[in-house]
């Protein structure tokens, strides 16, 4: 079976906006980049539970975005394509937040 083509997402809905602003999150709850940025901020100040909640939201928004753009659950999502970076960061933040709350199974 041939591998699928790499997914190249369109621009993140919150691209160019302040990802940490409440107004941005309220206007663009479908933005993985918003939730990834919020998770990263909360981890940096030690609020592991809130970081995990933001990261989990970002992960699910990422899956929604990938599937809406033809991803079938496998195949490359290159970080070199800038609009993919919010999705990839959201997935990475879930791993980091999971580790922070002691959920090793989710981290692995």
Predicted regions and their residues:
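Start-of-helix signal in alpha-solenoid helical-repeat scaffolds, especially tetratricopeptide repeats
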Residues: 32, 81-88
């Amino acid at each position: 079976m041939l591998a699928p083509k790499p997914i190249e997402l369109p621009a993140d809905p919150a691209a160019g906006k302040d990802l940490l602003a409440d107004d941005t999150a309220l206007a663009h709850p479908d933005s993985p980049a918003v939730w990834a940025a919020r998770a990263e901020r909360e981890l940096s100040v030690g609020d592991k539970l809130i970081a995990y909640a933001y990261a989990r939201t970002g992960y699910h928004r990422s899956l929604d975005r990938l599937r809406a753009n033809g991803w079938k659950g496998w195949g490359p999502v290159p970080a070199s394509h800038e609009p993919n970076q919010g999705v990839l960061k959201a997935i990475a933040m879930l791993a980091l937040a999971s580790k922070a709350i002691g959920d090793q199974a989710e981290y692995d």
